[in-house]
Amino acid sequence: MTQDEMKKAVGQAALAYVQPNTIIGVGTGSTVNCFIDALASIKDQIKAAVSSSEASTARLQALGITVVDLNDVTEFDIYVDGADEINPHMEMIKGGGAALTREKIVAAVAKRFICIADATKQVEVMGKFPLPVEVIPLAREYVARELRKLGGNPVYREGVITDNQCQILDVHGLQITNAKALELVINQIPGVVTVGLFAQRGADVALIGSPDGVTTITK
């Protein structure tokens, strides 16, 4: 299978976790787009979706899937999203698509996080993929200085404004051996909206696409 075929395979496999007449949390990115396309085939069997980005909302609505505001939902069963990296502890780096804050919020409300990814995203130690940090524009340079103190090399992602009207710093050069601790430390820096570490709330199930098919990993 090609990488695109692996993404389609895990998107299709995630449908097995969708229960009838429920609300589905939907992430953002190319792999999630494959899930959204697959979800359209059973759209009459679900209540609605909660979306983590304007891009996913547009795709869902274009396929005739109702999107509801997270503020109108108390909880829902599953949140389906991709990852830029995922380690054996089911901790992830996310935010390559700049939707990390809304993704983290929607994931927090879901009972279960279903991560869908191709095998190239599996790593033993996270950090080769630059760690995204969403920041208030006023604080960008201050946050960058603090991130350098942690051993990282933050690079401003020029030309990108998040759905929250904030900016992204991509932190290169980290070897993340304690993701839970680093997530807390970075989130405490004034001016940080959130860091793209999903460790405090990691994945419960990972559907990993490879040339041999889809492998299911559970926490």
UniProtKB/Swiss-Prot annotation:
It holds the Pfam family Rib_5-P_isom_A. Keywords: Isomerase. It catalyses: aldehydo-D-ribose 5-phosphate = D-ribulose 5-phosphate. Pathway: Carbohydrate degradation; pentose phosphate pathway; D-ribose 5-phosphate from D-ribulose 5-phosphate (non-oxidative stage): step 1/1. SUPFAM superfamilies: D-ribose-5-phosphate isomerase (RpiA), lid domain, NagB/RpiA/CoA transferase-like. The active site is at E103. GO terms for biological process: D-ribose metabolic process; pentose-phosphate shunt, non-oxidative branch. Substrate binds at T28, G29, S30, T31, D81, G82, A83, D84, K94, G95, G96, G97, K121. Gene3D superfamilies: 3.30.70.260, 3.40.50.1360. Homodimer. NCBIfam families: PRK00702.1 (NF001924), rpiA (TIGR00021). Belongs to the ribose 5-phosphate isomerase family. This is Ribose-5-phosphate isomerase A. It comes from Tolumonas auensis (strain DSM 9187 / NBRC 110442 / TA 4). The gene is rpiA.
